Amino acid sequence: MADESPRKIQSLETAHRITEALQELDGAGASAIADRLDIGRSTAYQYLMTLREEGYVTKREQTYHIGLKYLDHGMYARDNHPMIEISRPSLRDLVDETGEIGWCTSEDNGKLVTLDIIEGDRNLNTKFRGRIGNREYMNAHAGGKAILSGYSDSRIMEIIDAHGMPSYTEQTITDEEALLAEIERVRERGVAFNDEEAMEG
C-alpha cells in the first residue's frame, strides 16, 4: 500500500522560511538569511532572486524586504473571510456604544489572527491598537480564550501541544490546567476577559 502521509516540498518550505526571516529581521541580506536558516549563501541568494522576480521580495540598497505582492494575497484572504461581513455591523455598534477600540479575531492553524480593527473616540493608547494580520498565541488574549471555549478540551490541548503557552506578562496563563479552568469559566459566563495577560497597563 502506498504511503499516503503528507510530504513537505522542501523548496517551498525554504521559500516560506526566508520570507518569515525577512519579516522577523525587518529586512536582511543574503548572508544574514543564510546564517539564520543555516543554508548556503548562494542558496539564499538564488531564493531571494527568484522571490524578487516573482514580486514577493523587493531590494532597497543592499537589503531585501518582503514585497507588496503579499499584501494583495493578504487583503484577498481577509476580505473574503466570512467573519468580516458577519461581524462588522456588531463591531461597529459596540465601538460606537463604548468609544473603545474593537477587534475581530479568528483562529487560524492554532493562532489568533486579527481580521478587523475599529477605533473608538476614547481610544488614546496607541499600543493597544495592534495590527490587522497579527498572529498571536491563543492563551494570552480574551478573543483567543473566547474562541477556545467553543472547542473541545482535546482540540485545545492539540493547539497547546503545537504552539505552546508563552508568557507575555506575569499575568499570562501558562499552565495547562489553569487555562482549561479559565476556559470553563468563560463557558459558564459567556464572556472572556483579558487581565493584563497580553501586555501590562
Feature locations, PLM:
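N-terminal helix-turn-helix
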Residues: M1-I84
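Amphipathic alpha-helical effector-binding/dimerization core
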Residues: M75-A162
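Short loop->beta-strand "edge-of-pocket" segments that line small-molecule binding or catalytic clefts
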Residues: P166-Y168
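Extended hydrophobic
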Residues: D175-G201
